[in-house]
């Protein structure tokens, strides 16, 4: 190598070393800033706080760090150095939990939902702007239960996700979230018999598996046709049915008692007449407060058969002691056609339930803590309590007031929606009482 070549390469080598040191220092500084940002205590002060799990807190303060709530109290001084969010005259409540949603935040029609998460789905912003921070998502436009014309089948392809838009980290909460069954309305007794037979086979399999494990022997092979039934009997997640009438409700209760699994009823329209039985069996219900399944021109005989206006059903279940979660009329987000009847108006559906006799407290619980309990994630979500995830909303008014807007939405302690910086609802003036 000539001296001229060496002389040319020396500046290049020095430049490379300088640039490497610069980028390493920049990356280190960025990591430090991110770490400091994540670990900083944040506080909302001066708000009317609705914890859901307890009474309203006036002039309340909510503090959190590293994505977890530290304290919720009245007139609590924010820790020194905390990042303050002034909420004087505003409301704070937990993020809404949609107990069932279709296709939001995912790009998959089947298979593993965790591998098909889409944090850049534009519908996430719309949902966040309307207060939803968590939902159970199913990929297909079908929610299992009775009332289908196809064969007996079921599945567990569902997941609980958070709407961390643009951020895959922390998005997946739980997968699978539920089991669900389709039991056709035709030949109901035959399918009931088949269902019981498969549960018997699953129970026998579990007994053989337990015996093999006790002897440290090879476990028996599990048939693919029994996997779902075994999962139901293991009861690691609830199982959901959609009964079309009270006869089918009784079938579900019978199976649940006999085999010891936790059942959930999706839209049991007439079951308000046997709501006390559901409450005694600790069976949660998912109900709509709006819908076309009621004819206001009907008279006595139809009412005697159990017809009740959808707006009154949630309150009827609550009065009996049932755990109620509110469903929107549509389980996706519509960007065209008839608006105001989908996930974007979940809080309005809760307000309709109040019109039908529910208290404000129960209605808010029906879109926060109750869905979290049904999905078995209430140890983290659904209320503002010490140690739970900092998923919360700052609103211009009471969350069930149709005039209220979400001003900020936090998930895992991070700000994911800011009305002032978003195109969603920013141009609409705030009105009404704060």
Task: Show where each model-derived region lies.
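Active-site core of metal-dependent hydrolases
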Residues: 113, 213-310, 325, 373-375, ...
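Bacterial N-terminal signal peptides
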Residues: 12-24
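Polyanionic/metal-chelating signatures
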Residues: 128-263
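C-terminal cap of metal-dependent C-N hydrolases
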Residues: 50, 385-429
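Bacterial N-terminal signal peptides that target proteins for export
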Residues: 2-14
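Histidine-rich, glycine-flanked metal-binding segment
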Residues: 34-40, 49, 53-93
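His/Asp/Glu-enriched, well-ordered alpha-helical/loop segment
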Residues: 110, 238, 279, 288-291, ...
């Amino acid at each position: 190598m000539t001296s001229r070549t060496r002389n040319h390469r020396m500046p290049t080598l020095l430049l490379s070393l300088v640039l490497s040191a610069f980028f390493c220092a920049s990356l280190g500084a960025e990591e430090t800033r991110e770490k400091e940002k994540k670990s900083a205590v944040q506080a909302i002060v001066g708000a009317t706080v609705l914890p859901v799990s307890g009474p309203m807190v006036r002039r309340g303060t909510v503090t959190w760090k590293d994505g977890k709530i530290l304290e919720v109290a009245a007139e609590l001084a924010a820790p020194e150095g905390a990042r303050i969010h002034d909420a004087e005259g505003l409301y704070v409540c937990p993020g809404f939990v949609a107990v069932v949603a279709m296709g939001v935040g995912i790009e998959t029609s089947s298979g593993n939902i965790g591998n098909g998460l889409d944090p850049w789905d534009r519908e996430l912003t719309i949902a966040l702007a309307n207060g939803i921070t968590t939902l159970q998502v199913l990929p297909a436009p079908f929610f299992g239960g009775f009332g289908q014309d196809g064969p007996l089948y079921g599945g567990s392809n569902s997941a609980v996700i958070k709407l961390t838009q643009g951020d895959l980290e922390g998005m997946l909460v739980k997968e699978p979230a539920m089991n669900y069954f389709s039991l056709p309305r035709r030949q109901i007794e035959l399918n009931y018999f088949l269902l019981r037979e498969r549960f018997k086979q699953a129970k026998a399999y579990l007994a053989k598996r337990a015996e093999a494990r006790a002897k440290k022997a090879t476990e028996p092979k599990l048939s693919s046709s029994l996997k779902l039934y075994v999962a139901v009997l293991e009861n690691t997640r609830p199982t959901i049915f959609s009964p079309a009438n009270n006869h089918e409700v009784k079938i579900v209760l019978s199976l649940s008692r006999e085999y010891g699994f936790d059942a959930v009823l999706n839209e049991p329209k007439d079951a308000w007449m046997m709501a006390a039985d559901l409450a005694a069996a600790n069976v949660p219900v998912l109900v709509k407060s709006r819908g076309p399944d009621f004819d206001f021109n009907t008279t006595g005989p139809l009412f005697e058969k159990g017809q009740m206006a959808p707006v009154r059903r949630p309150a009827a279940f609550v009065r009996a002691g049932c755990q109620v979660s509110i469903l929107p009329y549509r389980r996706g987000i519509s960007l065209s056609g008839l608006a105001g009847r989908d996930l974007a108006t979940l809080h309005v559906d809760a307000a309709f339930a109040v019109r039908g006799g529910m208290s404000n407290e129960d209605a808010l619980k029906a879109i926060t803590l109750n869905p979290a309990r049904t999905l078995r994630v209430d140890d983290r979500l659904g209320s503002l309590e010490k140690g739970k995830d900092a998923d919360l909303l700052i609103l211009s008014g009471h969350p069930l007031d149709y005039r209220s807007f979400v001003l900020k939405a936090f998930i895992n302690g991070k700000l994911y929606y800011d009305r002032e910086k978003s195109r969603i609802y920013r141009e609409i003036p705030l009105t009404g009482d704060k």
